[in-house]
From Swiss-Prot:
Heterotetramer; composed of 2 small (MOCS2A) and 2 large (MOCS2B) subunits. SUPFAM superfamilies: Molybdopterin synthase subunit MoaE. This is Molybdopterin synthase catalytic subunit. Pathway: Cofactor biosynthesis; molybdopterin biosynthesis.
Length: 179
């Protein structure tokens, strides 16, 4: 029989091996997976550019209810090498499609208390329309494709694992095809 002290945590799950970053300075792409609170100002600082006339920032925060059940906190897990690869593809596609001058995608892992941010999306572009569209599109694609799993923990003691893509931007259930 072994105790929890005898077992070693795999490196990809060990909070001591974080933060995980991926940066592409040629396209001003900044990606992060971290157990620490997310910093909105840091994200804005990274995308700031003299060529940018628009900076858009989105913070996804933990709310206190889900379908009339009181939520105590959320918890997120991921496989960082795969998740960062997916996020890099999303960021590169957004830069190319919308002509962005910068993009940050940062996601928190582990426990995220009520009112704290679990995701930061920050984008900059020459004009507002491209930035608005890119910010929303990046968020929706991250929820659909990024290998990040969420556990909702309820005040009544229950919990449920969810895929981010189970709900649309208005919180309505999405039917996911198995094909």
């Amino acid at each position: 029989m072994t105790t929890s002290e005898d077992q070693t945590t795999p490196a990809h799950l060990d909070p001591k091996t974080y933060p995980r970053h991926l940066t592409d300075p040629t396209q001003n792409i900044h990606l992060e997976l971290t157990y620490s609170p997310l910093n909105a100002q840091s994200a804005l600082d990274k995308i700031s550019s003299p060529a940018a006339g628009a900076n858009v920032l989105f913070l996804g925060t933990t709310r206190n209810t889900f379908e009339d059940r009181a939520v105590s906190q959320l918890s997120y897990t991921a496989y960082p090498p795969l998740t960062l690869k997916t996020l890099a593809g999303i960021a590169r596609d957004a830069v190319a499609k919308h002509g962005l001058t910068g993009i940050v995608i940062a996601h928190r892992l582990g426990v995220v208390p009520i009112r704290e941010a679990s995701i930061v999306i920050a984008v900059s572009s020459g004009h507002r329309r491209a930035a608005w569209r890119a910010g929303e599109e990046v968020l929706e694609i991250c929820k659909e494709k990024a290998e990040i799993w969420k556990r909702e923990e309820f005040v009544d003691g229950g919990m449920e694992w969810r895929e981010n893509r189970e709900r649309d931007g208005e919180g309505k259930k999405v039917v996911v095809s198995e094909n």
